[in-house]
Amino acid sequence: MNITKFLNKVYFAPRLKEIEQYAPLPLQESFDNAGVQVGDVNQPATGALLCLDVTGEVVDEAIEMGCNLIVSHHPLAFKAFKSLTGSTYIERCMMKACKYDLVIYAAHTNLDNAAGGVNFRLAELIGLENVRVLSPQKGALLK
């Protein structure tokens, strides 16, 4: 989905902060890697592509559509790289994103755990009542 008009003549950082106000990064699980995966958030936005998973095809589509922001639910990389050589699929996606000045941003378990986030919305859609947190995160208000 191209939301170019929404992002026209704005910078990423303030828009990404809006996402993080709704789904704060501290709500992510310890295994997760939500937030900016790669890219310079201080560049002007040309458009955004939303996806569930970042793939090579998604990166190519963003480039073809002139979108320099990819917002994904699942992170492209869950762990830090020791080197970036292009020897793996994920590394090649990251390198191509860098080459074309793309920003990749993931809102994963922080969005799942947010009040009104994915899990709350799914519960609402299937008609659950009295929805409550089953296992609160230590130091967090919601899970």
Residue ranges, per PLM feature:
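Hydrophobic structural segments
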Residues: 1-143
